[in-house]
Amino acid sequence: MDVFKQSEVWFVIGSQNLYGPKTLQQVMDNAHQVVNSLNNEAGLPVKLVLKPLVTTPDEITALCREANYDTACIGIMTWLHTFSPAKMWIGGLSILNKPLLQFHTQFNAQIPWKTMDMDFMNLNHTAHGGREFGFIGARMRQQHSVITGHWQDKEAHQRIGQWMRVAAAKQESQQLKVARFGDNMREVAVTEGDKVAAQIQFGYSVNAYGIGDLVAVVDAVSKGDIDTLVEEYEATYRFTDAVKLNGDKRENLLDAARIELGMTRFLEQGGFKAFTTNFENLYGLKQLPGLAVQRLMQQGYGFGGEGDWKTAALLRILKVMGTGLKGGTSFMEDYTYNFQPGNDLVVGSHMLEVCPSIAKEEKPLLDVQHLGIGGKADPARLIFSTPAGPALNASLIDMGNRFRLLVNVVDTVEQPHPLPKLPVARAIWQAQPSLATAAEAWIIAGGAHHTVFSQAVGVDELRLYAEMHGIEFLLIDNDTTLPAFKNEIRWNEVYYQLNR
């Protein structure tokens, strides 16, 4: 999955005609060098496109209008090389609906102490122009990001790359379609929510489809296509004896392949990039989709169990953010605890649906075993563990008057003991700052039992995603204390009530 190839970020230099053509030409010459260097040496995920210098209100407004309607443009990155009077930007910024990044840099890294004169000062005063631009953003209450640092600095490169990933995720959010196969699990609260409010806030649409709509596509899958897919399984995974040729669960594997092909075709035909299932809505399917869901997640689809459309959408968005990064991202659920002094652990898993992108094993184990829920035939699934390393769990919840993005930083650990009787994929982690504080804070904040678990995407990206959408962001990490966390929730409640 490479969602960045067709995307671009516009690099825009603001100035004014007061400087004269010679200075403005020097500004553009410097801009060409900066953009070429960033594109070729900074490892950015999205290409920068240098736009013509803007020096008048009409030019700025025209450029912002063009950015809004250019589907390749996922955001604008500005550099105030000189001074650009910010009243000129009001018209353009008032209509801009793409993410905005102010790169507070300058062409020279160090001051030429022996030769610096006023001509040099007037040409290289980002320190001056950047503050003017920042004021108008603050005055207009417009969300925009600021990154300060020299354009050859590696930390600046990393932060620009993070911003690009989040800008791409926002673009994906605005065009995302989520399919719900069946409805919400009966009587479950947190997986519900206001889909209209979500579409207004994030842009993605959520629509339900009767399970019969999916079954019709599944039943139309040919035997030849099933055989071809099973050959792919055999090349990709380790098989238990039960699912090998002539094994007593081989037919279950063939049924799972049929379901995967049918689901894939349904999603592709509808342009869906995220979906949900529900074990209470399986009429016409021979088994709960497990293997199919796992493989679709690995291909970049978002997924939520029991009709959880918010988690499905969030998973797709994090898949986009994490494209090309080390580590995977999966649907997850806190399942059970290990209470032990000095070694409190959480086992995360689900009935079947954990994404192989987080697998430690090069070839996960493919098996068919009994599932005591759903009332269907034994489903196929991939079984694996997760490598040690930093990770996070994220949950998007509907608080009625706002959406809340809740994140807990965790440390994934190696599985300390074999689990010979647990036939599902899993991840094991230590929650920051401790299991007790993390669990209590999560529960107090109303965090869902479903999460998006990621070893690829970090806190900074999710905080920025929340800022871009104007939603609440709460973080549980090593710096969290419960009194301060509770106070933050109280203050946020007041802020969002007043800011409606």
From Swiss-Prot:
NCBIfam families tied to this protein: PRK02929.1
GO MF annotations in UniProt: L-arabinose isomerase activity; manganese ion binding
Keyword annotations from UniProtKB, A to Z: Arabinose catabolism, Carbohydrate metabolism, Isomerase, Manganese, Metal-binding
Name the record gives this protein: L-arabinose isomerase
Catalytic activity line of the entry: beta-L-arabinopyranose = L-ribulose
Domain of life from the UniProt record: Bacteria
EC number: 5.3.1.4
GO CC terms, sorted: cytosol
